[in-house]
Amino acid sequence: MSNVPAELKYSKEHEWLRKEADGTYTVGITEHAQELLGDMVFVDLPEVGATVSAGDDCAVAESVKAASDIYAPVSGEIVAVNDVLSDSPELVNSEPYAGGWIFKIKASDESELESLLDATAYEALLEDE
């Protein structure tokens, strides 16, 4: 079973979301998602300043197996991207919940967080796959 940290929120598309002290949210893909994709070779990051809606594809993770869209779990403005991934996309594999984060977003409607899954619900989703 994949590692599913209890303090994070999750989307059904296998993104995770963590609230930061400054009120922004850090987004990445889950350990389960990176295991399915395999070794990352490139991450196409969103533009800082871009406004996205929940469910919009805003980044792409390319692995040796496939390219997979990464979706915004909530609506808002992209306020930072993990530029380190340009040279080290393998961090998505080795540190999916730490150094392998993809982008940070300032949520425009925090009520959208209610539609995300907690760790228990995400684990149940994985068991059904």
Curated annotation (Swiss-Prot):
Q: Please verify whether the record's keywords include Magnesium.
A: no
Q: Which residues carry this modification: N6-lipoyllysine?
A: 65
| Span of domain Lipoyl-binding | 24-106
Q: Name one GO biological process term.
A: glycine decarboxylation via glycine cleavage system
Q: Which SUPFAM superfamilies match?
A: Single hybrid motif (SSF51230)
Looking up CDD domains in the UniProt record yields: GCS_H
Note the Gene3D superfamilies from the entry: 2.40.50.100
In which domain of life is the source organism classified? Bacteria
Gene Ontology cellular-component annotations: cytosol; glycine cleavage complex
- Record key words, sorted: Lipoyl
Record text on cofactor binding: Binds 1 lipoyl cofactor covalently.
- Cofactor(s), names only, from the UniProt record: (R)-lipoate
Return the InterPro entries for the record.
2-oxoA_DH_lipoyl-BS, Biotin_lipoyl, GCV_H, GCV_H/Fam206, GCV_H_sub, Single_hybrid_motif
The entry's family comment says:
Belongs to the GcvH family.
Q: How does it assemble?
A: The glycine cleavage system is composed of four proteins: P, T, L and H.
Cited HAMAP family:
GcvH (MF_00272)
Relate the protein's function as given in its record.
The glycine cleavage system catalyzes the degradation of glycine. The H protein shuttles the methylamine group of glycine from the P protein to the T protein.
Q: Which PANTHER family match?
A: GLYCINE CLEAVAGE SYSTEM H PROTEIN, GLYCINE CLEAVAGE SYSTEM H PROTEIN-RELATED
Name this polypeptide is given: Glycine cleavage system H protein
* Organism, scientific name: Shigella dysenteriae serotype 1 (strain Sd197)
The uppermost taxa in this organism's lineage are: Bacteria, Pseudomonadati, Pseudomonadota, Gammaproteobacteria, Enterobacterales
